[in-house]
Amino acid sequence: MLEQMGIAAKAASYKLALLSSREKNRVLEKIADELEAQTESILSANAQDVAEARENGLSEAMLDRLALTPARLKAIADDVRQVCNLADPVGQVIDGGLLDSGLRLERRRVPLGVIGVIYEARPNVTVDVASLCLKTGNAAILRGGKETYRTNAATVAVIQQALEACGLPAGAVQAIDSPDRALVNEMLRMDKYIDMLIPRGGAGLHKLCREQSTIPVITGGIGVCHIFVDDSAEIEPALKIIVNAKTQRPSTCNTVETLLVHQDIAARFLPALSKQMAESGVTLHADDAALAQLKSGPANVVAVKAEEYDDEFLSLDLNVKIVAGLDDAIAHIREHGTQHSDAILTRTLRNADRFVNEVDSSAVYVNASTRFTDGGQFGLGAEVAVSTQKLHARGPMGLEALTTYKWIGIGDDTIRA
C-alpha cells in the first residue's frame, strides 16, 4: 500500500512544482469551500472517533482536542484561506549575480518534493499541513494519530476531491488511513519517495524516527522551556510573564516548565509567586531551597523529583529551582533543556546578552514570554512544526522551511576556461 502511495506522491510532486501561485491559491480556496460544503460527512467520522476514544478512557481534555464542531471546522477552512494570503516563497531568487566568466548565476527557492508528516491526534493538523505543503508545491503523505484516523480519512477525501476538481492528482495529498503502527516503521524507510519527514508527537516518536528513519528528519516540538528570574528582575512584570507562559495554554510546547530563580531575589520573589500561582491553580514542584520558602504560602507545593526537570508537563505544573546565578541557570538549561524556548527576566544588559549568546535554543527571549514561539506570532503565518534542531530549519517552520533551493546558471554559449 505505501509503495503505491509513494509512487503517486512523487508523480504528483512534479506537477505541483510547476504551478503558479495563482493556481495553488485556487486549489486552496476550493479545499476551504469543500470543507464547509461537506461538514456533515467530516463531523460524522469525527463523532465515531470521539465515541471510540471515550470508550478507551481518554481524558476529557484529550477528547476536547479530538472533537470537531461546525464552528471549529469553519475556523479550519478559514485558516486555509489565510494561507492563500501568505507570500509564496517558491521561485524567489535568494541571491545571485554575473560571474567574471560571463555566467549569470542565481539561487532560487524550489519545493522539497514529498513531505511525510507523522502527528498527534489533532484533526486540524491534517488540513494545516496539507495546505502548507500545497502552497509550497509539495506533495504530502500524512499519518495522523490512531484516535482520529476516521476523521483524517474523511478530511483527506475532501481535499482529494478538491484537487481533482482543479485538475490535479489526488496523490498530491494522501493519508495512511490504517491505525496499524507497523505502517509507521514502513513509512520511515520510504526514502525513495519521501524527501523530508516531520514527526509531531512525544519523545518516543521522535526517538523512533531519529533511530529508524532512512529519510532526513526534522524533529522538534518537545518543549522543556525555562524562565530564569535574575536578581535585577522587577517582580510584578516578571509575574505577569510567568503567568502567561504557564497558564495561557498549558498543553502547548512553548509553555514554561521550569522556573529558575536567582538566590538573591528568592526571598522577595517566591512569596509573590506563591500567591499568583495559587490564584492560577498551578502546582509548584520545588527544590529543597525553594520548598523551604514556599511551603508556608498559599500555592500547592510538592518536592520536585530529579526526573521532573526533564519532563514536559503540558499541565498546570511548574518546577521551581533556586540557582546561585546566571552561570548556574545556563548550566541547568544546557543539561535539561530541549533547545526549544528559554527566557531571562532581567534589567541587566550584560546578563541579557550573555543569556542570549550562551543558551543554545531555537528561540531565546529577554523579558518576554516563551509563548511567542509560534509561526503566527513570528509573522510567518501558519507553521507545520517547531524545529529544535539546526538543519535545515530551526524554530517555527513556516513556508520557507518547506522549500530548498537550486543553483541556476544562464550562459551565452559560456564555457569554463
From Swiss-Prot:
Its main location: cytoplasm. GO terms for cellular component: cytoplasm. The keyword Transcription regulation does not apply. Its EC number is 1.2.1.41. One of its GO terms (biological process) is L-proline biosynthetic process. It catalyses: L-glutamate 5-semialdehyde + phosphate + NADP(+) = L-glutamyl 5-phosphate + NADPH + H(+). This is Gamma-glutamyl phosphate reductase. It comes from Citrobacter koseri (strain ATCC BAA-895 / CDC 4225-83 / SGSC4696). The gene is proA.
